[in-house]
């Protein structure tokens, strides 16, 4: 029997079978995906084969080939990865310039990982109703930056409804992963997009100005227009996984394009003479924040924080 994984609670997976049944499934202890050492070998969005047992539950026996997936390192020094979701048409990264602040480093690491696994990303700048003049000016500068690179950007307020209709249109006929820090308003936005869903939300911690985790597991919801949303737990940091040092620049489109003009084919864009990328940063054709994010990923790689999957 075949089906779609629509919910993952850690030890159990909820599968919607092709004939419409909802079946609670487990995986066998030795289940591994070839080439991936992951804390969750099965992810929401996976197409699977299941074997029913007498209790009405089932085992997942096989995963169909994935179109793509989004993966992050489980923790800073971990050799294992965590797959956020699989078989995506797009990601929507929900960010805020305050309450709490989403750093450009976090944004860039997420974008680089999505580039590596061929998942298009749209950036949703939420809480535009809450910002002062300086914050709105900074937000506009970020929108200019990421739009020029090629990432569609949207200004929204999940609270007031500003921009929500435009996002609703973008969901039609697509499987969309929603991701971002805790507290950026992801669950509030999903509730605004799909009335009646009532995904649990929480207030921002006033003491730390950080969000509190409300979604504790990944889950897929249908949306009007034959689309699906995958809601994931808020994440503090985004450790990219399974990237070789020489590949990292490939996942920054503007750095990759400019690197064709570097003197050396294996230029890492740090100290090498004749580096077109460094020159472009100095002349403000490449954003300094993007270049800083690129360097931080190289530095982490050198410190051994990025490990090849096996």
UniProtKB/Swiss-Prot annotation:
CDD domains: S1_YloQ_GTPase, YjeQ_EngC. One of its GO terms (molecular function) is GTPase activity. Zn(2+) binds at residues 262, 267, 269, 275. Its main location: cytoplasm. It is an enzyme of class 3 (hydrolase). PANTHER family: SMALL RIBOSOMAL SUBUNIT BIOGENESIS GTPASE RSGA, SMALL RIBOSOMAL SUBUNIT BIOGENESIS GTPASE RSGA 1, MITOCHONDRIAL-RELATED. Monomer. Associates with 30S ribosomal subunit, binds 16S rRNA. It comes from Bacteroides fragilis (strain ATCC 25285 / DSM 2151 / CCUG 4856 / JCM 11019 / LMG 10263 / NCTC 9343 / Onslow / VPI 2553 / EN-2). NCBIfam families: ribosome small subunit-dependent GTPase A. This is Small ribosomal subunit biogenesis GTPase RsgA. One of its GO terms (biological process) is ribosomal small subunit biogenesis. Residues 77-238 form the CP-type G domain.
């Amino acid at each position: 029997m075949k089906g779609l994984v629509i919910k993952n609670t850690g030890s159990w997976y909820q599968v919607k079978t092709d004939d419409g049944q909802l079946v609670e499934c487990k995986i066998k202890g030795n289940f591994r995906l070839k080439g991936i050492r992951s804390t969750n070998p099965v992810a929401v969005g996976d197409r699977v084969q299941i074997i029913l047992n007498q209790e009405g539950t089932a085992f997942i026996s096989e995963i169909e080939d994935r179109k793509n997936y989004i993966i992050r390192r489980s923790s800073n020094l971990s050799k294992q990865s965590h797959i956020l979701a699989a078989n995506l048409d797009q990601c929507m990264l929900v960010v805020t310039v305050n309450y709490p602040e989403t750093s450009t480093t976090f944004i860039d690491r997420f974008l680089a990982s999505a580039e590596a696994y061929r998942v298009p990303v749209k950036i949703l700048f939420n809480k535009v109703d809450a910002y002062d003049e300086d914050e709105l000016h900074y937000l506009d500068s970020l929108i200019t930056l990421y739009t020029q690179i090629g990432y569609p950007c949207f200004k929204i307020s999940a609270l007031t409804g500003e921009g929500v209709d435009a996002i609703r249109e973008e969901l039609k006929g697509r499987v969309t992963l929603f991701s971002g820090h805790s507290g950026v308003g992801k669950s509030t936005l999903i509730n605004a997009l799909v009335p009646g869903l009532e995904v649990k939300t929480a207030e921002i911690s006033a003491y730390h100005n950080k969000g509190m985790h409300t979604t504790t597991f990944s889950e897929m919801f249908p949306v009007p227009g034959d689309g699906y949303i995958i809601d994931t737990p808020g994440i503090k940091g985004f450790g990219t996984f399974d990237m070789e040092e020489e590949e990292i620049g490939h996942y920054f489109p503007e750095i990759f394009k400019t690197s064709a003009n570097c003197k050396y084919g294996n230029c890492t864009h740090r100290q090498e003479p004749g580096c077109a990328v460094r020159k472009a940063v100095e002349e403000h054709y490449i954003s300094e924040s993007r270049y800083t994010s690129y360097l931080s990923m190289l530095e982490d790689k050198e410190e051994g924080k990025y490990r090849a999957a096996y």
